[in-house]
Amino acid sequence: MMEGNGTENSCSRTRGWLQQDNDAKPWLWKFSNCFSRPEQTLPHSPQTKEYMENKKVAVELKDVPSPLHAGSKLFPAVPLPDIRSLQQPKIQLSSVPKVSCCAHCPNEPSTSPMRFGGGGGGSGGTSSLIHPGALLDSQSTRTITCQVGSGFAFQSASSLQNASARNNLAGIASDFPSMCLESNLSSCKHLPCCGKLHFQSCHGNVHKLHQFPSLQGCTSAGYFPCSDFTSGAPGHLEEHISQSELTPHLCTNSLHLNVVPPVCLKGSLYCEDCLNKPARNSIIDAAKVWPNIPPPNTQPAPLAVPLCNGCGTKGTGKETTLLLATSLGKAASKFGSPEVAVAGQVLENLPPIGVFWDIENCSVPSGRSATAVVQRIREKFFKGHREAEFICVCDISKENKEVIQELNNCQVTVAHINATAKNAADDKLRQSLRRFANTHTAPATVVLVSTDVNFALELSDLRHRHGFHIILVHKNQASEALLHHANELIRFEEFISDLPPRLPLKMPQCHTLLYVYNLPANKDGKSVSNRLRRLSDNCGGKVLSITGCSAILRFINQDSAERAQKRMENEDVFGNRIIVSFTPKNRELCETKSSNAIADKVKSPKKLKNPKLCLIKDASEQSSSAKATPGKGSQANSGSATKNTNVKSLQELCRMESKTGHRNSEHQQGHLRLVVPTHGNSSAAVSTPKNSGVAEPVYKTSQKKENLSARSVTSSPVEKKDKEETVFQVSYPSAFSKLVASRQVSPLLASQSWSSRSMSPNLLNRASPLAFNIANSSSEADCPDPFANGADVQVSNIDYRLSRKELQQLLQEAFARHGKVKSVELSPHTDYQLKAVVQMENLQDAIGAVNSLHRYKIGSKKILVSLATGAASKSLSLLSAETMSVLQDAPACCLPLFKFTDIYEKKFGHKLNVSDLYKLTDTVAIREQGNGRLVCLLPSSQARQSPLGSSQSHDGSSTNCSPIIFEELEYHEPVCRQHCSNKDFSEHEFDPDSYKIPFVILSLKTFAPQVHSLLQTHEGTVPLLSFPDCYIAEFGDLEVVQENQGGVPLEHFITCVPGVNIATAQNGIKVVKWIHNKPPPPNTDPWLLRSKSPVGNPQLIQFSREVIDLLKSQPSCVIPISHFIPSYHHHFAKQCRVSDYGYSKLIELLEAVPHVLQILGMGSKRLLTLTHRAQVKRFTQDLLKLLKSQASKQVIVREFSQAYHWCFSKDWDVTEYGVCELIDIVSEIPDTTICLSQQDNEMVICIPKRERTQDEIERTKQFSKDVVDLLRHQPHFRMPFNKFIPSYHHHFGRQCKLAYYGFTKLLELFEAIPDTLQVLECGEEKILTLTEVERFKALAAQFVKLLRSQKDNCLMMTDLLTEYAKTFGYTFRLQDYDVSSISALTQKLCHVVKVADIESGRQIQLINRKSLRSLTAQLLVLLMSWEGTTHLSVEELKRHYESTHNTPLNPCEYGFMTLTELLKSLPYLVEVFTNDKMEECVKLTSLYLFAKNVRSLLHTYHYQQIFLHEFSMAYTKYVGETLQPKTYGHSSVEELLGAIPQVVWIKGHGHKRIVVLKNDMKSRLSSLSLSPANHENQPSEGERILEVPESHTASELKLGADGSGPSHTEQELLRLTDDSPVDLLCAPVPSCLPSPQLRPDPVILQSADLIQFEERPQEPSEIMILNQEEKMEIPIPGKSKTLTSDSSSSCISAAVPVPPCPSSETSESLLSKDPVESPAKKQPKNRVKLAANFSLAPITKL
């Protein structure tokens, strides 16, 4: 069903054919009013459409007669019987009348609802639920008739004879569907309970209803009980009717109600599927009954109507349905009654319309529905016409399969053509247009959907010659020549602007699990796995795990799993017969098989064989088993309930939820009943008789699950009672554990906390079963529903190329089909990580949307959809801990709610649900105070804070997935009592502010083993206060200096030792210790012992970069903590707001970045410095920059300080990097980054070099193009350095592997493409941006896109910035292009746009570019004709071009700034490089050097062509080397020749294939040197060879042209002198060419004697042409000095060998003709004009 048409009301205006004249008798039916007239149409609301515009009918009504031609003449007025004589007395009945049921219906209660209505063609019909109740009567003023057509036989009215016939239908909704009663001609022994009813939509007034009498051919008339017509949730229950009762039904009587004008349809039968399809309609209350209406007293005309036309056309429940036409007063005939012929003749009077769609030119937009396009075409153009043709032409192998399927479903003729053939689609459509013109006559309408100018001739012919009405649906770039011939013009972009997206044709693929039991326990797992793999391999199975006597297999889809289950069931696995099931068994099953309780749970293999994994079916199986064995104990009942309702995976839940998602919760609960015990312990519970008795109605309801339409509420009283007494609890797998409101009661899953694993739409690696566990209803109070306020759905992998508005609209439309959407929020449009959060109203709708829309294509990407749990997923205990950590730092442990929320979200990185705070009754209290709420920590929860706060430690292990933990040791002695010099040291008298940090000068290479030795003697810990004393005692003097005297802080220097750290004890004393409380292994990588960067708040990452940038500007990278805030303010010109990072104290913020910042000392005199890890990283970057600035990429250690000064303009100070010697920090850098070598007794630091292979260089060139493509989609063509890798992976769908390009670091790869990418450093942050040249190229492409989207390809200069921001999503910055105004910018883009002054102001216009293809061919000829050096400078190439073609070469005319850029855009043809003189040069690629030889070879042959099987030998003989196609990357000669389509092409088939030189390549230029292969064939000195340059290949040579300019007609004629001995018509034709045929040329010439050969005196200017390829030399008289050639003349080779010339005075004319044209490009006709103006053409095509 197409969206968007459901609100259309076909009865918004009064139907003329339902009205009666005021003076007419009520029993007269006037058929002249059965046809709508223009004057009968009342004004209607703009929301509604005219009836004929609605094409969503069940059958395509092609034979509708004209209202003006087929009025009352065909159907005269027919008197109807007196209605008053048919009224029945009103009799009171009981509230629930008894309705007898037929023997074929299921044994249902007498109150079982019956479905009336039906339709064909998909869902075109409508239906209603009718509950038995009191009978209807009618007191309305209007008349409605009921159709009697083929349908189900009516129930005998014997039980309804005393029914009441009065009712009031004033409550019917205005959009009530059409109704008609259907009966059957043949009497059946067993008649169904009810027939089908269609209700016509009513206007404000309600139609009068009449009694329906007995009909001829029917056993009896039926009274049909109905209920009130409401607009509630529609539903249906379907009758059960055997196949034999359906097929022979024929239409007996029919009144035309719905179709205007009436229709007589052909056919006899209808299909069962159309009648059985559910349809949506209103529900009928049980308070009203349907009256009986008398039809006209006529003879039956048994015309069976086909209700299904096979096209799958769908309609909405509010649209008119299929109606039957009748023939009054005529005898019945089984088939082919005269009325059909009459209707067909009337239909022929309507003008035909044909639609011809060039779908390759005007294609269906990506992700849009072709059905909607076809429907829109029919709605727009088909009114008042009959569809005669609807054809589209395309290559079905190239077109989207979904589009082809939709076109076929819409009965559009899809003609297949070969996409590689030139103009194949255009030729096919033109042929169809001509056939349409020959078949139909005016008046007729032709709708052409194309922009191709090739149709101009046909449109002109159809309009002016045939008188057709032409409607052209075209794109914006349509040619004026095409637009001129259409009567109506419609823009294709506007026509399809608001198309709905295409619905997914198939469900997303999900994996299915299969469980195998009874495996042998005495075999090793590998053998069992191999056996299972062999059994399931042909079904695509994979063994996931084997545990004990069970195993789990995974299959790619449900079908494969079911097929594997059938094949593997009872198979022998090492002596055991295995059991295969979709549902997992309890764990005790394999362990204790002898247990009686477990044995009752085990089902036989036969019962386990085909579980359908559906909630409804599982419920029915469980309830049916309970019904069959009501006497069994509670264990059997509970066991079956638990077992049979198991579902294997998350996808099953999604699939089941999507099936039942359209029903409301009450209906769903009514059909998902389970027999459950009333206690939480299922093993001890005893099922009550009341619960056991629920099984029967549950079984019947679930048995009819296929007959339930959406949103029906039909629960029986027994079920409603059961809802109050039974609790249905669902236990989801780990990924869905956040979605459940109930607590697990299984002893295996005793934990009440929710799983913290993240959601994933595809649980490929999880085998958790989805079990419906029995729970006590009291558990709901302990675990409230986390989705009470709706469910959030996360959408990722969104196409960022679409605008935000369009994305929001598409997501809204997609999710609205699965339930009510509360909101759609899009994340910021940055770094390709555009995401959306869609909030659905309830969990069921969200799960259904996840199942249906996962990998649904929106734009050019398939979105990834998953449920988002948000703050609801946090356990209360974790939330309590997080809340305490925030409030403990607040004054008085209280914070305003808004402030608390802000700090919480910034600190923990996720949203806070305030309602969850109210659940923490034992932790916090929320009080109303003043204008807001206050969150306070309860006194019982205020934990004692450490006096040191959260002191830092660099431990390498962490439980929070971060290597950084804040370690607090137990109490530790403040000093070493053994070595402390101050023996009277007192901890209580020690003032931390008095501690002075010592600075030392030491070698780290020497100091590191000493520290480890010191820790070894001190049992692993040394107090920092006494560390100098202990060191002196162990190793002698310690060189201590004052600050700023070249020393390094001792505390920092200690942390430079690998494996050693400084921690803080609980009493505030810093202690030197090993990281893992033991010495590190000798081979441990020191980097593994360093602290790693924490993964957390991106604000902290930004702050850490700012800290590095600030500290490296300080002397020795040290700053007092008291100076941090003012220095930060001065350095960054902004305040450092601690609260912005989620902290309340500065020390906490500084401690939050321990990977970059180290806090030295204690008390108020603490110092801040960079960690050793940050210093090494900083030094590495500086060293690489220094080395790259050197010409040799290396530096001698002795000259390092001088090189450092030159590079950074400051003196070298090693203490800036936290060490005392250069070698200490150089040794920390990995060998893959720099290397140390010894050269001439000098230590040299250099960058390790590795010669890259040619493949790696080529990949790097391709990588540069990828970078350009990636950055062009970024705002301002720049992005952060750290976002490149994820963005690259997201954009291209592959990883960026540095080794693939021959690098080990990403920065080195970027430095290898300096012409494309620049790396800008903004402090510690690096920014990637395109170079200036690439930026302007990208901007030019944006301007082209922007202007092409505008009308007339122009835009006012004042609107440029606004339109730019609207189109690309970010503002345009002029400073990025070093311009101050738009005018200056347009001057730099003169090759793309131009500025024009018009009346309204300055306008930016898109310039018209010249064809690059023709220029490419011309440049290729120049380069192939150049025989000097292997390369040619760009300037020389330009000069040669201008001198050869006498035309200046302006690259701007082709859309390029320079000729170099133009040549670089042809990478497969030429290579552009810079020579030693820094000149830009160009040369042919290796492939086109081969093409150059091929061109020279073919110039030596007749007609420049050669047989393919002779090519290799000829090439080897010509060039002198064997042809090896693999050298050029191709496997065969034919494939190699196909790789140079600009030079040659291959025609013919089989052994007759010929290699033909392209026409563009045939010219040989005299301005360039000749081919070396032809030097030996040059004439002697007395003779000269002159070659004529040609400008195009279709020109012809005219000999003896004098100075006067002859007419164009004379130039086309070949005029021969009378003394020429050559007879061109008698020369033999080469055997390789087909026989020619002579035919008149249609060229209309001026009045002249075309046969006459004019005799002209020979002039010295006449020349002869030498055919060098045939090695014939024709002398030219000495007096012939000049060669006159028309600019269009071509150098033509002789077709035949010429005999020797006996005299030097004789002149010969040799003619060459290429009879075959290239298929890749349609060339002008190249025909030889003979004396009689005949032309040569081949009879057959090879």
UniProtKB/Swiss-Prot annotation:
Residue ranges, annotated region (Disordered): 619-646, 681-717, 1677-1726
Domain HTH OST-type: 875-949, 1003-1079, 1099-1173, 1175-1250, 1259-1334, 1335-1410, 1411-1485, 1486-1560
Sites bearing Phosphotyrosine, chain numbering: 699
Residues with PTM Phosphoserine: 66, 760, 1091, 1093, 1571
Pfam families (UniProt xref): MARF1_LOTUS, NYN, OST-HTH, RRM_1, RRM_MARF1
NYN domain location: 353-490
Cystine residue pairs: none
Gene Ontology annotations for the cellular component aspect, listed alphabetically: cytoplasm; Golgi apparatus; intracellular membrane-bounded organelle; membrane; peroxisome
One Gene Ontology term from the biological process aspect of the record: female meiotic nuclear division
Keywords: Differentiation, Meiosis, Oogenesis, Peroxisome, Phosphoprotein, Repeat, RNA-binding
Domain (RRM): residue spans on this chain: 791-870
Biased composition (Low complexity): 1679-1696
Assembly, per entry: Interacts with LIMK2.
UniProt protein name: Meiosis regulator and mRNA stability factor 1
